[in-house]
Swiss-Prot record:
Substrate binds at residues 105, 147, 170, 230, 266, 270, 290, 299, 316. PANTHER family: ALPHA-2,3-SIALYLTRANSFERASE ST3GAL I ISOFORM X1, CMP-N-ACETYLNEURAMINATE-BETA-GALACTOSAMIDE-ALPHA-2,3-SIALYLTRANSFERASE 1. GO terms for biological process: ganglioside biosynthetic process via lactosylceramide; keratan sulfate proteoglycan biosynthetic process; memory B cell differentiation; N-acetylneuraminate metabolic process; negative regulation of activated CD8-positive, alpha-beta T cell apoptotic process; O-glycan processing; protein glycosylation; protein modification process. Disulfide bonds join 59-64, 61-139, 142-281. A beta-galactoside alpha2->3 sialyltransferase involved in terminal sialylation of glycoproteins and glycolipids. Catalyzes the transfer of sialic acid (N-acetyl-neuraminic acid; Neu5Ac) from the nucleotide sugar donor CMP-Neu5Ac onto acceptor Galbeta-(1->3)-GalNAc-terminated glycoconjugates through an alpha2-3 linkage. Adds sialic acid to the core 1 O-glycan, Galbeta-(1->3)-GalNAc-O-Ser/Thr, which is a major structure of mucin-type O-glycans. This is CMP-N-acetylneuraminate-beta-galactosamide-alpha-2,3-sialyltransferase 1. GO terms for cellular component: extracellular exosome; Golgi medial cisterna membrane; Golgi membrane; Golgi trans cisterna membrane; membrane; trans-Golgi network membrane. Changing residue 147 to S: Decreases the affinity and the specific activity for both donor and acceptor substrates. Decreases the catalytic efficiency for the donor and acceptor substrates by 17- and 32-fold, respectively.
């Protein structure tokens, strides 16, 4: 009798589990695509759904960026469905996004964007989103390292290097400043005019502000024919093709609309890095943002503390961007390390 009860319990448990999983996957599939009742197609769909389930499992950090209903201000701005990287599957821009993007640097007679993107993905892998494919840890900790002079004598280097991802931007040298800025870089955000040579294992994230930026990256790893945009740019770069990622133009507009509320002409690389990291990381720490303790705005590699022309260009609203990051820190979505 006891054996029969155990067997019955096992059968019931199996049936409940089977019904639950079947219901879950069918409902999930229905939200994505219409279900096709061919065995091979079903297996593929179940496999893809299982991958998505694993990728998007709950964060295990103490404070998880994506957690909602903790701040109305944050919930109004953060859109988890936005895709930060351009791929062959999501490359079609809506008309209003395309028109807005074209105005950023007022490019004269740009080439056809669709043709440019097709050529881009003949050279750069564009069939998957590498950042999301790598999402295999319960708590991904990321350091976003800005270029502020407040990093000098901060001794943040080892702390920065302890993160899973370390994002840097533009010129950002590390040689000679290792104790303060660290040695590790996993992703480096650049545009053609700010490019610097990267380490072999560093992923380059190109931030395109105009069509020629996309053409440049193709040229720079193939023919080397583009050596000038509005200023001279490197004709050739040494970056592995599978290490080249493209920041999505629609994501730039999302940052501008949702987070900057239209302040400035367009977002700085700094705030683009911050919001990008919030969408691919579970925990984000900022280093090298803002002025130093004396109120000076300068780069950590500059010997002139009073420098800060980059803040006075009128292109970016540095004060508003600073307020955004300060607010994010105040509601425990990110942490800011202010250095010296």
């Amino acid at each position: 009798m006891v054996t029969l009860r155990k067997r019955t319990l096992k059968v019931l448990t199996f049936l409940v589990l089977f019904i639950f999983l079947t219901s879950f996957f069918l409902n999930y599939s229905h939200t994505m695509v219409a279900t096709t009742w061919f065995p091979k197609q079903m297996v593929l769909e179940l496999s893809e759904n299982l991958k998505r389930l694993i990728k998007h499992r709950p964060c295990t950090c103490t404070h998880c960026i994506g957690q909602r209903k903790l701040s109305a201000w944050f919930d109004e701005r953060f859109n988890q469905t936005m895709q930060p990287l351009l791929t062959a599957q999501n490359a079609l821009l809506e008309d209003d996004t395309y028109r807005w993007w074209l105005r950023l640097q007022r490019e004269k007679k740009p080439n056809n964007l669709n043709d440019t993107i097709k050529e881009l993905f003949r050279v750069v892998p564009g069939n998957v989103d590498p950042m999301l494919e790598k999402r295999s840890v319960g708590c991904r900790r990321c350091a976003v390292v800005g270029n502020s002079g407040n990093l000098r004598e901060s001794s943040y280097g080892p702390e920065i290097d302890s993160h899973d991802f370390v994002l840097r931007m533009n010129k950002a040298p590390t040689a000679g400043f290792e104790a303060d800025v660290g040695t590790k870089t996993t992703h480096h955000l650049v545009y053609p005019e700010s490019f610097r040579e990267l380490g072999d294992n560093v992923s380059m994230i190109l931030v395109p502000f105009k069509t020629i930026d996309l053409e440049w990256v193709v040229s720079a790893i193939t023919t080397g024919t583009i050596s000038h945009t509005y200023i001279p740019v490197p004709a050739k770069i040494r970056v592995k093709q599978d290490k080249i990622l493209i920041y999505h133009p629609a994501f730039i507009k999302y940052v501008f609309d949702n987070w900057l509320q239209g302040h400035g002409r367009y977002p700085s690389t700094g705030i683009l890095s911050v919001i990008f990291s919030m969408h691919v990381c579970d925990e984000v720490d900022l280093y090298g943002f803002g002025a130093d303790s004396k109120g000076n705005w300068h780069h950590y590699w500059e010997n002139n503390p009073s420098a800060g022309a980059f803040r006075k260009t009128g292109v970016h609203d540095a004060d508003f961007e600073s307020n955004v990051t300060a607010t994010l820190a105040s509601i425990n979505k990110i942490r800011i390390f202010k250095g010296r």
